[in-house]
Regions:
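Interdomain hinge/lid region at the active-site interface
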Residues: 182, 207, 212, 219, ...
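NAD(P)+-binding Rossmann beta1-loop-alpha1 motif at the extreme N-terminus of oxidoreductases
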Residues: 1-64, 70, 96, 133-136
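C-terminal amphipathic alpha-helical interaction region
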Residues: 402-403, 407-479
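Rossmann-fold dinucleotide-binding core
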Residues: 82-87, 100, 106-218, 226-251, ...
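Small-residue-rich helix-loop
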Residues: 223, 348-381
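Glycine-rich, highly charged phosphate/nucleotide-binding loops
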Residues: 54-61, 78-86
Length: 479
């Protein structure tokens, strides 16, 4: 087979198929391959008019169809399936060729694969892709890792197929070496979990405390989407809440089983944050909320537990409460992104990636699930101060939270009185209050640790590490 294709895509499920079409629509000749050849030929037959495809049935045909240096995109399930594809194709490649993994791989696997393939002279580019099947087709946010050399070759193609922000900037940048791209995509998904949880809590408050119907709440979200909460997730929330089930005539949200599933990237975000010592409490609560929702038997057994008598607000009070919920949602959102960017910064430092946080926020402005007008503000904050220790240290965000905090607290009081669970809002406020506190009970915790385990402590008034002889005369000794 002649060498004709500028890029190849193997793994033609929805994401792979749409990504291949995106490349073809943008003028590239695309070699396509799938484990089952029928899917390959079906793609070319159905979408061949969109651009130039080269259908291949075997690994050798696929590799032979690619121009040198070869660019091979893997779009298969993370884990063992990805390793299996690499084992199949790597022996057919030459030094200078590159394998691009566009799946949701764990960044540690990406680091391993990059190291192993580098020894063969093959570039491995772990690439986070966000936007779902629509984004893959029409322009996703793309987070490539790997070497700078590989990005010099691949970058122009990714820039062409990526989403474009409002200022027409492509939503792609070289994030950092080896696993940086998949690490940033992981944290993106963690923030997505937190965003969705906060939106869900806002919905529950508007329904159970304010007494609004799903259709009325949809209108409230549409109004919010014209302001500072303008985002893809707020937009689709209004669409979901306004949808009516054709079979029953009930609001769609009332006929969906209230058990939220998850694929694992949110859980990874929390696990890695624990390893790095980074508090991502909002993301953690979002993950735990999904887990709790799935324990149907436990929830059924607990429905008879005592709780407050719920009394929805009157119509005149409901509108004011909705405004307070908007404040609480926005303030909590700031905290969620603060925690997410803290984890990215910590990962960058731990693994030597030198990630530009402003650039990350810039490529999340379009194409991805968490795209929001709010990200322009984050980019501006990091561009002005690349060493910004926290988004809460930015003057603008600090002022906005200061203006929102009274309403934020009132919303949580109302939720507690009515028995509405708001773990995301509560975790965000607790994080904010902990950061601004003059003293934390951690001093007592450290004293307890010293008492039962001789774990020592540091003093506020002099340097050194100390231990109290709790079982003796309680004198203090230098550790």
């Amino acid at each position: 087979m002649s060498t004709t294709a500028q890029i190849g895509v193997t793994g033609l499920a929805v994401m792979g198929r749409n990504l291949a079409r995106n490349f073809a629509r943008n003028g590239y000749t695309v070699a396509v391959h799938n484990r089952t050849a029928s899917r390959t030929h079906a793609l070319v037959e159905e979408f061949g008019g969109e651009g130039d495809f080269v259908a291949t049935e075997t690994a050798k045909e696929f590799v032979a169809a690619l121009e040198r240096p070869r660019r091979l995109v893997i779009m298969v399930k993370a884990g063992d399936p990805t390793d299996a594809v690499i084992r199949e194709f790597a022996p057919l490649l030459e030094p200078g060729d590159m394998i691009i993994d566009g799946g949701n791989a764990h960044f540690a696997d990406t680091r391993r694969r990059e190291r192993e393939l580098r020894e063969q002279g093959i570039h491995f580019v772990g690439t986070g892709i966000s936007g779902g099947e629509e984004g893959a087709l029409n322009g996703p946010s793309i987070m490539p890792g790997g070497s700078k050399e590989s990005y010099a070759s691949l970058g122009p193609m990714l820039e062409k197929i990526s989403a474009k922000a409002a200022d027409e900037a492509p939503c792609v940048t070289h994030v950092g070496a080896d696993g940086a791209g998949h690490f940033v995509k992981m944290v993106h998904n963690g923030i997505e979990y937190a965003d969705m949880q906060l939106i869900g809590e806002a919905y529950q408050l508007l329904r159970d405390v304010a007494g609004y119907t799903p259709a009325q709440i949809a209108d409230i979200f549409r109004t919010w989407n014209t302001g500072r909460l303008d985002s893809y997730l707020i937009e689709i929330t209004a669409e979901v809440l306004s949808h009516v089930d054709a079979e029953t005539g009930k609001p769609f949200v009332d006929v969906v089983v209230d058990q939220a599933e998850q694929k694992g990237t949110g859980r990874w975000t929390v696990q890695i944050a624990l390893d790095l010592g980074v508090p991502v409490s909002g993301i953690a609560e979002a993950v735990f909320a999904r887990s709790l929702s799935g324990h149907a038997a436990l929830r059924d057994a607990s429905r008879g537990l005592a709780g407050p008598t719920a009394t929805p607000l009157g119509e005149s009070e409901a509108a004011a409460f909705a405004d307070r919920v908007e404040q609480a949602l926005y303030a909590s959102k700031i905290v969620s992104y603060t925690q997410g960017f803290h984890e990215v910064a910590a990962g960058s430092e731990e693994y030597g990636w030198d990630i530009d946080l402003g650039a990350v926020s810039a490529i999340w402005r379009g194409g991805c699930i968490i795209r929001a007008a709010f990200l322009d503000r984050i980019r501006a904050a990091y561009d002005a101060r690349p060493d910004l220790p926290s988004l809460l240290s930015d003057e603008t965000f600090a002022q906005e939270i200061a203006a929102a905090q009274d309403d934020w607290r009132e919303v949580l009081i109302a939720a507690t009185r009515q028995g509405v669970p708001t773990p995301g809002f509560a975790a965000a406020l607790a994080y904010y209050d902990a950061l601004r506190a003059e003293r934390l009970p951690a001093a007592l915790t450290q004293g307890q640790r010293d008492y039962f385990g001789a774990h020592t402590y540091r003093r506020t008034d002099r340097d050194g590490t100390f231990h109290t002889l709790w079982g003796g005369d309680r004198s203090e000794v230098t550790a």
